[in-house]
Amino acid sequence: MLKSKGKKGGESMTKKVIKGRSYDKEYINQLEWLKEKGVWDKNPRTVYEDGNKAYSKRGFDHTILINKGTIPVMFSKRLYFKDAVKELLWIWQQRSNKVSDLQEMGCKVWDEWEKEDGTIGNAYGAQLAREVDDTGMNQVDNLIHKLKTDRDSRRHIVTLWDISSGHEMALKPCVYETQWVVLDDELYLKVITRSTDSALGEPYNTWQYWVLLQLIAHETGLEPGGLAFSMAIPHYYDRHETEIERQIEYYKKNKDRIDNEEVVVGIDLSKGFYGFTADDIKIKDYAQRDDIPKRKFEIAI
């Protein structure tokens, strides 16, 4: 495993305050597009906990761009940002597929998919742990190494998709690939998903990969650029539609306030990628606020 090294130059380089606007506008626009243009599926694989089929309204090929000055946090729906970071670290930092490792961090988002052996099968972290042929490193260390030594390469790709072991996975990866691009010492990230639960997964994943971009950029001596979150099949489920309509309406009623809200993120990068924890990132005054709606969406399995 590569050793993490913080940038030289003291605390100012490793403890950052990042300010920007929320991405409510982009997110709500996507929900409205999906509501208007989406098509209901007819024979879904997914079911709710009660055994009923979970029908989804689906669209095709939508990308949300998170440019500099935008932070993927919302005020029309509360984001549980600590759990999202814990899951990210479980996959990318620990490269684990053991559900107990995530539970030890106080996060239970994978409990429904735990197999008899206590894992989620050969998925997510297990794929990142695989060795890359030309370096013998795991996929994460290989990415960090190549971004330091071959920045202009157009092959900085990390993949979670494996056609040889998909049958062993509790859930085939939704986010299945990332591509990293360096432009003028800035690091850009494209995230590709095969399937995106727009109500539950998308806000969670967009925040995760924005955080990952900050971490990998710092680890490789680059400045974070933009994030493109590309969804092949964005969708929401039938039991999500009413709450989605409430969220859209809430945003429209509070648009002026929400669009002018400033998001302030504090992130401590001093311990490097492998020392970073969920406690090293905070959204100023976010968790304490009672005017950010908590929205409940049933999980489809």
Write out the residue ranges for each language-model feature.
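Terminal, non-catalytic protein-protein interaction segments that mediate quaternary/complex assembly
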Residues: 2-301
